[in-house]
């Protein structure tokens, strides 16, 4: 399963993990020294959000910061004619509203 938000497109990013030793100057030491830098990944906080649209249950995988946007989409979809469509087609129509 992909680690990408379906609404915002947030995806994992690469960041550095820095290991240090020593005492900080502000605490009376000679300063921190870097002893190692390694790559790490930071993942978006993806959550599954299930909503009911046109009698169908649809699941979105979205970042936690965009959960309210899903409910906004559902409100906007009330004027659309979505009856008779499959859940996948309904989801596609909702994402077009963005």
UniProtKB/Swiss-Prot annotation:
InterPro entries: Bacterial_rp_bL28, Ribosomal_bL28, Ribosomal_bL28/bL31-like_sf, Ribosomal_bL28_bact-type
GO MF assignments: structural constituent of ribosome
Single GO biological process annotation from the record: translation
GO CC terms: ribonucleoprotein complex; ribosome
Record flagged with keyword Ribosomal protein: yes
Keywords, sorted A to Z: Ribonucleoprotein, Ribosomal protein
Subunit composition and interactions: Part of the 50S ribosomal subunit.
Family affiliation: Belongs to the bacterial ribosomal protein bL28 family.
Protein name: Large ribosomal subunit protein bL28
The organism's taxonomic lineage, starting at the top: Bacteria, Thermotogati, Deinococcota, Deinococci, Thermales
């Amino acid at each position: 399963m992909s680690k990408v938000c379906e609404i915002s497109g947030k995806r994992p990013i690469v960041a550095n993990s820095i290991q240090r030793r020593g005492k900080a100057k502000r605490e009376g030491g000679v300063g921190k020294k870097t002893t190692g830098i390694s790559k790490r990944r930071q993942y978006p906080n993806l959550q599954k959000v299930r909503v009911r649209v046109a009698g169908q249950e649809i699941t979105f995988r979205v970042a936690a910061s965009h959960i309210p946007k899903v409910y906004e989409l559902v409100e906007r979809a009330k004027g659309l004619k979505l009856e008779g469509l499959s859940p996948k087609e309904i989801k596609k129509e909702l994402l077009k509203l963005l």
